[in-house]
Amino acid sequence: MILTLFSTIIRRRWFLVCLASILVIITLNSCSPSEFKTKAAQVSQIVFISPSDPDTFNSPQSESLFSRIVFGLLYDGLINENGVTAELEPALAESWEISDDKRRITFTLREGLKWSDGEPFTADDIVFTYNEIYLNEKVPTGVRDILRIGTSGAFPSVKKLDERRVEFTVPEPFAPFLRYVGGITILPKHILQESVRTTDANGNLKFLSTWGTDTDPEKIIGNGPYRMVNYTPSQRIIFRRNPYYWRKDTQGNSQPYIERIVVQIIENPDNQLLRFRTGEIDSLEVAPEMFGLMKREEKRGKYKIYNGGPASDTRFISFNLNKARNHKGEPFVDPIKSRWFNTLAFRQAVAYAIDRETMKNNIYRGLGELQHSPVAVPSPYYLSPQEGLKTYSYDPEKAKQLLLDAGFKYDSQGQLLDWDGNRVRFTLLVKAEEKTRVDATVQIQQDLKRLGIQADLQVLNFNVIVQKLQSRNWDAYVGGFGGGGVEPHSGFNIWYSQGSLHQFNQGPQPGEPKITGWEPSDWELEIDRLFEAGVKELDDRKRKEIYGRFQQIVAEQVPFFHLVNPLSLEAVRDRIENIQFTALGGAFWNLYELKVQPD
């Protein structure tokens, strides 16, 4: 689950996305420049793409989505999530046991595990990583947020049982804990312990300045399938196979099979497409507007466009429901508009007024599905329309009737007026960086105009949008969140009424000026209770019922009206074998199994 709208969600959820597989993040695209093909004719390799340089090689401190490409190659988790089935599978841990009271998980490591420098990987590394890094208040890391258990926010405890066994204890049953803790990066104690226990001249832990991007890449030690050997900023990162990696196939051959990975840093999407069409790139995410061209060239270009079905991302329109006032006593939202937005019939009318079928066919070129829920379709907790989820088919007449029944009215020019004669007009935000989203927002503007509503479109830079949302200074916006995998609790900070990403009714946040008059609605508090119940319930059937009720509330109350979910499409060269493409895992979740045939 994977670009996101907000930078904070990257801090809080990058490690969750990695749970889909240590390598799911490589689905960002890939390329193979001719200079590397020439120099490495005898070396099997794939060249991936990153649109940006990594911000650091110190994974707990990274806030960059694209740094995950590096970490996915350098590290394995204790367990992996299968990119096809979403089932949890052994990785560094060969097995795990859960106590009868569901509060203790004991992991048993594989025998003979080693770091990429040949040193043993043991339970000491796990205990060190958790106790001295992730749970260390002096180390700023978003990982610590996801380790908070239940409503108390208490942390798990971890202790070594012997060289190969480690035990985690949680203060109360917490259903997602195994999936969360099993995928978090473990760091080498023998390399980093001194930096965590000593400070620099300014009194800061030396760890905070350790493994920056100016570090010799060969000094970055991992436990994953590859080791980093070269980094040229704004150009490329080169990885070689880790000779100490633990995986072997059924014949006893070492994995991964591919010797070298090159990550080319190419920011411009047009340049990425150009390089793919000239044969220099091995893989490319296929946007709807480029599908026709790429499909026509599929055979000549010797690639296949894989279709994983609907992506796990969400796209929606949302209104600002916040009734609070800032520290000066001024309302965040114009009270006149706030009354509209907080009228359920208004939100439902907007939902009926948006022609999503036309949006899917014209803007997404038919390469998408209507989206009805914040939970990804591949998730076992997804509630489908066939199972009773409320949906909104395009029905402008029903939309008008809902508004009239709620006390709205029309003037002689067909403009919608509220109870007091105010024209219904508001600002609709969308980020400029995604053409498809802008086009969809223009259509929404036109659909609402036919309903008598004037939506003034503002196409703004991503960072400006973030600032407006965080300051509560907005009316409505078209946005989206990256996929959180199959676990609904990964959206906790979006849906919990006091969550940091509860943008449609943002409560008080740490470090900001005092706000007054904020209150969550009854249905928001009900969602709080459902999320609290969902993480304590360990029976999957009952969890599905709990999260089904959550999805039904969202559908009925429409804090987000979900739009079109594009298909997960990726073009991959035919010479790369053993691809098992899914929307959940992408093309390269099983990179260790892939083979490359000579051109």
Residue map of PLM features:
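Short, low-complexity disordered leader/linker segments with a strong preference
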Residues: 1-44, 157, 412, 416, ...
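Extracytoplasmic/periplasmic ligand-capture domains
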Residues: 30-38, 84, 97, 103, ...
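General beta-strand recognition
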Residues: 47, 89, 104-106, 165-167, ...
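N-terminal lobe/hinge region of extracytoplasmic solute-binding protein
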Residues: 49-100, 131, 138, 221
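A structural "hinge/loop" feature
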Residues: 52-69, 92, 119, 142, ...
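Acidic glycine-/aspartate-rich tracts in secreted/extracellular proteins
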Residues: 53-54, 112-113, 173-174
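Surface-exposed binding/hinge segments that line
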Residues: 108, 145-203, 232
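Glycine-rich and polybasic anion-binding loops at the starts of cofactor/ligand-binding domains
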Residues: 563
